[in-house]
A protein has these predicted regions:
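Structured catalytic-domain cores with a bias toward divalent-metal coordination
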Residues: 1-148
């Protein structure tokens, strides 16, 4: 049986520090999220986090592409190289593949704690339903952003 692994990402935007704090709390309490599933915790954009910037060269969320064949100028962008590294590590064919990635964010929008979903994959709906049932969180389906 394959190991089920979930990637939990905080600090995708370096100026969003609450998710990083939450991940540190999860790590402190060894059994807080253990249900027979292996978790990988990472800071998505560590350099931007260290500097307190949203990003260095480009939005990390917009830096994931199907192909690594970018033009030479954009290849020098930190976030594009970081996105390639993350896919090489945690993508479906990566060295530590994860079946699901949960990207934690903060916002100034008045929407409270919630789940925002992109796309309509069945497994994602199942996970969102599980979280909604367990924590009573509202779920927002975001489909207008073609970049997602």
């Amino acid at each position: 049986m394959t190991v089920q692994r979930i990637l939990i990402v905080s600090g995708t935007h370096g100026n969003e520090i609450n998710p990083i704090w939450a991940v540190k709390q999860f790590n402190r309490e060894e059994n807080s999220l253990k249900y027979g599933i292996e978790y990988e915790y990472i800071i998505g954009n560590p350099i931007a986090y260290e500097k307190g910037y949203r990003y260095i060269d480009a939005d990390l969320n917009r830096s994931f592409k199907e192909s690594k064949n970018y033009d030479q100028q954009k290849n020098s962008f930190y976030e594009i190289n970081r996105a390639n590294f993350l896919v090489d590590q945690f993508g479906i064919n990566g060295s530590k593949p994860c079946q699901i990635a949960i990207d934690l964010h903060t916002t100034t929008a008045n929407m409270g704690t919630s789940i925002v979903m992109y796309g309509r994959r069945f497994k994602d709906f199942c996970l969102a339903a599980l979280l909604q049932n367990k924590f009573g969180l509202p779920i927002y389906l975001h489909e207008k952003d073609k970049a997602q």
